[in-house]
Amino acid sequence: MKKSLLGLTFASLMFSAGSAVAADYKIDKEGQHAFVNFRIQHLGYSWLYGTFKDFDGTFTFDEKNPAADKVNVTINTTSVDTNHTERDKHLRSADFLNTAKYPQATFTSTSVKKDGDELDITGDLTLNGVTKPVTLEAKLIGQGDDPWGGKRAGFEAEGKIKLKDFNIKTDLGPASQEVDLIISVEGVQQK
C-alpha cells in the first residue's frame, strides 16, 4: 500500500512539474480570438478607436518563470481600420503609418517581469521605420483545455506610445499626442 501511495504521489508531482514548464503558443487569428486595438483622443472630447485586422504572432508562457516568456508579433499596417474609409486612407499615408514604405510593424519582447498579478512585457516595437522600447502591462485572463483537445491561454495587454517617438509628426493637437494600445490575444498551444 505504501509503495502504491508513493508511486501515485511521485506521478502527481511529475505531472504537476510538467504543467509548469514553458509552452509555446500561436495567436489564434483564424478563430478571431485576438485583437490589436488602439485609441486616441479626438480634440480632447472623445475617443477614436481603431484596430489592425491582419496580424500574426507567437508567445511562450511559463507561469512559474516569467523571465522565460517571449512575445513576437507582426502587424500588417495596411489593415488599419477605424470604421471610416477616408480616415483609414489618411492613416496609411506618409502623414501617419506610411504603409507603402513600412507595410509591417513588429513587436519582439526583450524582458518579462511579474508585477503582482500582472506581467510587464518590455520589447522593441518597430513602427513607421523606427524601433523603440515599449512596455505593455499584461494580465492572464485564463488558460486550460479547449473542446478540440488542445490547450489555450489568453491575455489582455495595455500600453501607450507617443506618436512623435515613431516619426509621426502630424500635429493632432495637445490631447492627441499619445495612442493607447489595447491588445487581447488567445493562443493555441503548439505541440
From Swiss-Prot:
Signal peptide span: 1-22
Gene3D superfamilies: Lipid/polyisoprenoid-binding, YceI-like (2.40.128.110)
Subcellular location: Periplasm
Disulfide bonding pattern of the chain: none
HAMAP family: UPF0312 (MF_00780)
Organism: Escherichia coli O6:H1 (strain CFT073 / ATCC 700928 / UPEC)
Keywords (A to Z) from UniProt: Periplasm, Signal
UniProt record similarity statement: Belongs to the UPF0312 family. Type 1 subfamily.
An example Gene Ontology CC term for this record: periplasmic space
Chief subcellular location: periplasm
Chain's gene name: yceI
InterPro entries cross-referenced by the UniProt entry: Lipid/polyisoprenoid-bd_YceI, TTHA0802/YceI-like_sf, UPF0312/YceI
Protein's name according to its UniProt entry: Protein YceI
Source domain of life: Bacteria
